[in-house]
């Protein structure tokens, strides 16, 4: 602990240092200045820390305000996590991003990730894919985990199979979709009950706020068939599911059945063509 004055943080500061084993030369790791601002040893600027609201203030034109870095070469965790105790709701945002007007840094909302899983943007969503796809289940289950990208498919009830000559396919198994609908990337799709139109059912529950008051809030109704002990495997990694590109630019195996309105764009290789599916 160093209480001696330092540049720009008079009359004193709190410095946290460590030494190597049996060493005598301490190395600074972090410091807090007289105003309660904090910085780590390798940071260029202080950040303000408040019990109710944590802020990282950067008054430089080009420096990053916040950087999250994972340095382990085998990192397999989550780089940035936000957890909110309240049940899923439209009444709060998990993350929001703002732009300013020269004086107010929160003048306009540019991105919102709402507490019910909905996302909003004032501009574009840019992706490397070129088609819109939805997940469908194979009628044969694809138990051999066959690579079926580029195959045209038709519906069999609510499932799919390869299209036969003379049939009108609904789309093509996509290898690089821009958007994938009917995904279950966050949890088992049936974890919460829905009505006939696919909207979540909700129920009242009581919670206690920070002041000790009991408040009534709403949450989704848990499916009694949900088993939290079972590992959730996303449809992306299950062989019985595939993303069917329903519109956009798609790669199709040569010789596959095509729709009457589809337009061939080019040959990608000796075995693959690119078509505009519409």
Residue map of PLM features:
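Trimeric beta-solenoid/beta-helix "fiber body" segments of extracellular/virion adhesins
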Residues: 1-127, 143, 156-158, 164-167, ...
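Extracellular receptor-binding modules and their adjoining Ser/Thr/Gly/Asp/Asn-rich linkers
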Residues: 36-37, 97-101, 109-278
